[in-house]
Amino acid sequence: MDSSEIEVVPLDSNSHQSPTESPTITDVFSASAYGDLHQLKHFVEHNGSSVSLPDDNGFYALQWAALNNSLHVAQYIIQHGGDVNSADNIQQTPLHWAAVKGSIDVADLLLQHGARIEAVDVNGFRAVHVASQYGQTAFVNHIIVDYAADYNALDIEGRSPLHWAAYNGFTETVRLLLFRDACQNRQDNTGCTPLHWAVIKENVEACTLLVHAGTKEELILKDNTGSTPLKLASDKGHRQLALFLSKAMRTRKNSFVDKIFCGKLGETSYAPMLFSLIVILMVLFITSIVSASNLPKITAMVGLWACFGLSCGVYALITFYRVSRKDPGYVKRTGEANSQHTANDPLIDINFKNPSWKGNWSQLCPTCKIIRPVRSKHCPTCKRCVEQFDHHCPWISNCVGKKNKRYFLVFVIMGALTSFVGGTTAVQRLWRGIPQVHHGESWIKHIVIEHPDAAVFLFFDLLIFIATMTLTISQSYMIARNITTNELWNAKRFSYLRGPDGRFYNPYNHGLRRNCTDFLVHGYTRDDEVVPSSIL
């Protein structure tokens, strides 16, 4: 995919010059490029230089001012005859140049003075194409919201802004365009969709966004060579992408199962298996351990412990049901919002020029069409965004999030306690009830031969104990630090988990005591941020 993108000439602003150095400013073009209004006025008012004529390369002073967002320089040029629609040798206007670095202030000025938002260059690129090529997400959103830029416009090769953002791997721009329902299945002159181009460049995150927000149609569309995105990934040796796309194809085929189980069992789900296993183990515990005819009569103390273990098992089943059925903290979709105005365009009231928004485009969910809380994540299995998303657990067929994490912790604790009490009781009963084994025969071998049902119980009981204890320890550790599994595993991807020095910093960690107290009292840890001491 050849691009005729604007060549960005590296320019150093005055702030980057050393005290003994100054930029070489020889004419209105260099003065505009460096944003030197004083020198520009000198050239125009004393030397009689024109700001409406191009230089030897066909570039205009207003283009240089637009490129570097020099607002006052751009205003001066316009006031002195600069044409906001002046086009260079490849028909690019100052607005095209403003799109390269996302110069929103100058773009506003140009458009307010009559610049054409849909002006095209020789390649058919509009400002929205150029901004998408350079990943200027805020600029793209700004011209869409305020100036109704066509974000599905095609260049001469039939490529939309989404094609370019996917090709160059600008996931934030991809996310914004998908959020605004940009067309995903549009094929360019080579038959490629945005997903094809994301696969060709092995942009994994862009592919993930496109697949989750798309339909089966984009997965099976073929380019002019007859290749689907999956075939392209396989042919180019992109194994990770090929596996992901193959799984997505299988998931889309389970639409009938999705409809029956509300989408939760469309992918691997072990909840019925786990529920059945717990019930079977409880029955085995009663028949092969507590009331086994080939073991001595149970004592009152051991019987009490057995009853306690069974009670824990019953409570574990109750919490299992509750954590499986309870809302994990689904974020309301756009259609569920109270404000009709916000529902029409939830981005319209946000000040994207505010520095606090920088880097937070990941809050947009192109599938749910919502601006989700910072710590939330879209679950492709549940097909919903979940607040304080921890992980999707196939063993409970549900996500673990803000509203059901306490139930999940209780469930794994009860599972660990039940398996510990049951296993301990079983070992005590077998140890006391089995006579001395023959020479050369191990105790375990004797158990397997003489009490196979008890051996099966102990085997699965041990597996459950190891799994639930691991989860209990890991969940307790993360609750104490007020961090989720998703954040812990993907910390490098989240800008809010980095301090001023660029190192890992958890702004939600209020200390062991408060974190645990909040969780016990409210059922979840709070999202109040702690300001790093280094910037206080």
Curated annotation (Swiss-Prot):
GO molecular function terms listed in the Swiss-Prot or TrEMBL record: protein-cysteine S-palmitoyltransferase activity
- Transmembrane regions: 270-290, 298-318, 407-427, 454-474
Compositional bias of kind Polar residues? 12-23
- Active site positions: 393
Question: So what does this one do?
Answer: Palmitoyl acyltransferase.
- Family membership, please give it: Belongs to the DHHC palmitoyltransferase family.
Please state what the protein is called: Probable protein S-acyltransferase 23
- Give the species this sequence originates from: Arabidopsis thaliana
